């Protein structure tokens, strides 16, 4: 599955959101939220309903593989001057299970990436949460922008997105708009090489992040994971495992 970033000036406003446009909308394959945990990525029994999506056939895709990595059932992503995503639809109740847990790892951070520049919008590891926002909470300008984007990319272009990234230079805790569009907010969870080379556990209150960045009515509809090197031409290897939603007061599941 491969998704590519267009650099066309006519679509730059929502370029990073359009990377997820080819994913199916939430349906029977999506995870249903309960009191938790709600598993969305075990990677020990096949990929479904995760899918590979490619928007630009000219852009080199990443390589994705299921593997056991240091005893962990995981998805491995290898990226070499390439960009593609593995994504899936989700339906999750933010009032019940707002916290997303996962493990990830990288071999090393990128060297020349710079999230403040379009030319440097690459990451050793990247997790997308795409959002839907009720029409009543969208400005006329935003509705117009989304209508144009969907006329180009299709009806599943999301309203907004939060990206959790393993960066190479910005400090942990950095939050700023994506270099292509302010409808995607970048959140730096790891930075540099300090935690590289092994599995790192993350526990993030996505509900809180989404409400703060895009309003309380925004809800997750898609997840995607990747390593991203198409702009810098570098190489990266990342792993993802054990993605699941839990209640705010609950611990992440151990496997």
Feature map (PLM): residue ranges:
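Bacterial N-terminal signal peptides
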Residues: 12-26
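Extracellular carbohydrate-recognition regions
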Residues: 31-57, 140-147, 255
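Extracellular beta-strand elements of beta-rich domains used
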Residues: 43, 223, 241-245
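Short carbohydrate-recognition loop motifs
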Residues: 64-85
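Extracellular/lumenal carbohydrate-interaction signature centered on repeated Trp-anchored short motifs
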Residues: 89-100, 193-196, 216
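Extracellular/luminal beta-rich ligand-recognition
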Residues: 122, 126, 132-180
């Amino acid at each position: 599955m491969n998704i590519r970033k267009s650099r066309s000036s006519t679509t730059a406003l929502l370029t990073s959101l359009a990377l997820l446009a080819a994913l199916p909308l939430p349906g029977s394959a999506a995870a249903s939220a309960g009191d938790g945990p709600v598993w969305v990525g075990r990677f020990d029994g096949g990929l479904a309903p995760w899918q590979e999506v490619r928007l630009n056939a000219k852009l080199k895709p990443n390589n994705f593989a299921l593997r056991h990595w240091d005893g962990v059932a995981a998805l491995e992503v290898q990226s070499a001057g390439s960009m593609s995503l593995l994504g899936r639809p989700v339906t999750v109740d933010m009032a019940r299970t707002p916290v997303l847990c996962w493990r990830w790892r990288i071999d090393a951070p990128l060297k020349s990436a710079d999230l403040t520049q379009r030319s440097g919008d690459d990451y050793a590891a990247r997790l997308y949460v795409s959002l839907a926002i009720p029409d009543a909470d969208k400005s006329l300008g935003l509705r117009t922008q989304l209508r144009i984007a969907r006329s180009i990319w299709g009806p599943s272009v999301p309203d907004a997105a939060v990206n959790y990234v393993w960066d190479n230079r910005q400090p942990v805790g950095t939050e700023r708009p994506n270099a292509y569009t302010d409808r995607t907010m970048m959140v730096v969870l790891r930075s540099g090489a300090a935690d590289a080379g092994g599995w790192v556990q993350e526990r993030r209150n996505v509900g809180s992040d989404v409400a703060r960045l895009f309003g309380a009515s925004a809800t997750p509809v898609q997840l995607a994971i990747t390593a991203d090197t198409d702009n810098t031409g570098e190489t990266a290897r990342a792993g993802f495992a054990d993605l699941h939603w839990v209640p705010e007061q609950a611990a992440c599941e151990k496997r």
